[in-house]
Design a protein with these regions (language model features):
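Intrinsically disordered, low-complexity regions enriched in acidic/Ser/Thr/Pro/Gln residues
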Residues: 31-56
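Bacterial signal peptide processing site
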Residues: 22-25
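Hydrophobic helical h-region of N-terminal Sec-dependent signal peptides
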Residues: 6-15
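Amphipathic N-proximal alpha-helical interface segments
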Residues: 63-102, 138-162
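Long, charged/polar, surface-exposed segments that mediate recognition or autoinhibition
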Residues: 79, 84-132
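Short glycine-rich, low-complexity/disordered patches
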Residues: 54-68, 117-143
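C-terminal motif of bacterial Sec signal peptides marking the signal peptidase cleavage site
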Residues: 16-20
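Positively charged n-region of N-terminal signal peptides that target proteins for export
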Residues: 1-5
Length: 162
């Protein structure tokens, strides 16, 4: 009798631990969010977005994008992001209501790093400091050029490859 009870308790414990492990794996799978961007009208933009999605905190999916005449746009968090390609050049514009928007740093950082993977988070942080503290409106990071423009809707960050 004790042997049966012990076996039943062990089976119950194994069942509970297997169930708990299975459900936690589903919740923690970061790859589930990061699907390849496909079916865009523009191969350069598709390639860039797939590079961006590899490490971005806020990945962009094909369904998020609205395409029109060589450009695409979407919402990333509370920011409007517009991608424009011309010849071999890519321009990314990020519209924010406030320069201090906490999402702005993360999204712009990920967009810049996707454009030039040799840049570091620290270099991007220095750029933001330059814009916020020094009042600069343009910043050159080698292959990537950034501009900041104030407009009626807040601020527009423009990121271009050189």
């Amino acid at each position: 009798m004790k042997k049966k009870l012990l076996i039943m308790l062990l089976l119950a414990a194994l069942t509970l631990s297997a169930t708990a492990c299975g459900s936690s794996k589903e919740e923690e799978d970061p790859g589930a969010q990061k699907q390849a961007v496909t079916d865009l009208d523009n191969d350069m933009l598709e390639s860039y977005l797939n590079q961006y999605n590899m490490d971005a905190e806020n990945p962009i999916q094909s369904d998020d994008l609205t395409q029109e005449d060589g450009s695409a746009s979407c919402k990333v968090t509370d920011l409007t992001v517009t991608f424009t390609t011309k010849d071999d050049d890519l321009q990314v514009a990020v519209q924010a209501k406030d320069l201090e928007d906490e999402n702005l740093d993360v999204v712009v950082r990920d967009l810049i790093i996707a454009m030039d993977s040799e840049l570091t988070y620290e270099e991007v942080k220095d750029m933001f400091s330059s814009f916020r503290e020094d009042g600069r409106t343009s910043y050159d990071m080698g292959e990537v050029k950034c501009k900041l423009k104030k407009n009626s809707d807040g601020y527009r960050f423009i990121i271009e490859n050189d």
